[in-house]
Curated annotation (Swiss-Prot):
SUPFAM superfamilies: Ribonuclease H-like. Endonuclease that specifically degrades the RNA of RNA-DNA hybrids. Belongs to the RNase H family. It holds the Pfam family RNase_H. Its cofactor is Mg(2+). It is found in: Cytoplasm. Keywords: Cytoplasm, Endonuclease, Hydrolase, Magnesium, Metal-binding, Nuclease. Mg(2+) 2 binds at residues 9, 135. Gene3D superfamilies: Ribonuclease H-like superfamily/Ribonuclease H. This is Ribonuclease H. One of its GO terms (molecular function) is magnesium ion binding. Residues 1-143 form the RNase H type-1 domain. Monomer.
């Protein structure tokens, strides 16, 4: 099983506002950077999109170490999602889960992708090189959403 390190980040200028997501994938000496953006979005939606786009980019089952600075996404996918699904995508307070469309996409990728994923939280803006790269890519996604380029790119 291929080993892959993934760093993801989301950014939003205003919340809601124009936002972007960034992904850095590493497998051995190979790196791939992805980014994209949207208007009228939130930071949490962009954090989720980064992880969705990262896992969607994997072409075969992998052993993934996924680094993210969003406790919302990490706890959501490792802890909260089980209760949400059992309650028909409602929270413990019986409210509809926010961003349910993205949570369902992420759940499908995690459940059916065949990946072994280790979710690792890193403190944002703390100097972690992979997280800093993902942050810079997310900000490029914001720029694209604001009309300074295409809406999704890979390099």
């Amino acid at each position: 099983m291929n080993q892959v390190e993934i760093y993801t980040d989301g950014a939003c200028k205003g919340n809601p506002g124009p936002g972007g997501w960034g992904v850095l994938l590493r497998s051995g000496p190979t790196e791939k950077a992805l980014f994209g953006g949207a208007l009228g979005t939130t930071n949490n939606r962009m954090e989720l999109m980064a992880v969705i786009e990262a896992l969607s980019a994997l072409q075969r089952p992998c052993a993934v170490t996924l680094y993210l600075d969003s406790e919302y996404v990490r706890k959501g996918i490792t802890e909260w999602i089980h209760g949400w699904k059992a309650k028909g995508w409602r929270t413990a307070a019986r409210q509809p889960v926010k961003n349910v469309d993205l949570w369902q996409r992420l759940d499908a990728l995690v459940s059916t992708g065949g990946h072994r994923i280790e979710w690792r939280w890193v403190k944002g803006h703390s100097g972690d090189p992979g997280n800093e790269r993902a942050d810079a890519l997310a900000n490029r996604g914001v720029d694209q959403a604001l009309g300074r380029g295409a809406l999704a790119s890979a390099e």
